[in-house]
Regions:
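Cytosolic catalytic headpiece
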Residues: 10-173
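Juxtamembrane helix-loop transition segments at the membrane interface in multi-pass membrane proteins
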Residues: 1-12
Length: 173
């Protein structure tokens, strides 16, 4: 029974009360999902390549432990790219990162912003596309250089294998 799975319930009244439950709340990250966010879409403006934009973002977020920043660093490492150093960086709590990135490889550096759409708007960055069905519900990370919008990344935390089946089984109970 339940005790062999490590579940102990003290009193039958608790089991009886389960019949009246109509809502279950689960922690998403690491419970429903794998807990390993990954870049799943990259969109840049004309004239800016994926590599340039991602390396600028990676440089700005080099020392961040935020899960979205870690996803960017993992992507760079998987590609075998070197994250360029930044001259300075600043965390803007609940918004994103500001950094000064010197020129690197064949790319110009500049004043880099990485973060939320709201952060970009507050910093006077315009030209961002409207949020649409392809980005709805995903984690978006916007990137700008010298006040100009460069593009965005979408980052997803993959759902654990078998979780959809488990949730559907719970729904039927």
């Amino acid at each position: 029974g339940a005790s062999s799975c490590g579940i102990l319930i003290k009193g039958g009244n608790y089991i009886e009360n389960l019949a009246d439950i109509d809502t279950v709340v689960l922690d998403k990250t690491g419970t429903i999902t794998m807990g390993v966010p990954q870049i799943d879409h990259i969109e840049t403006i004309d004239g800016v390549g994926d590599k340039e934009m991602i390396l600028l973002a990676a440089s700005a977020e080099m020392h961040s432990v935020h899960p979205l920043a870690v996803a960017v660093q993992k992507y760079v490492n998987a590609k075998g790219w070197q994250t360029p150093p930044h001259a300075s960086s600043e965390t803007v709590v609940a918004r994103g990162m500001k950094a000064v990135v010197p020129p690197f490889e064949n790319y110009e550096g500049g004043d880099i912003l990485v973060g939320s759409r709201r952060f970009m708007t507050e910093e006077g960055v315009g030209g961002m596309p409207a949020v649409d069905n392809k980005t709805w519900g995903k984690n978006l990370l916007y990137i700008a250089k010298n006040g100009q919008y460069l593009g965005f990344l979408t980052i997803q935390d993959p759902i654990r294998p078998g979780m959809k089946k488990t949730l559907n089984r719970m729904r039927r109970l």
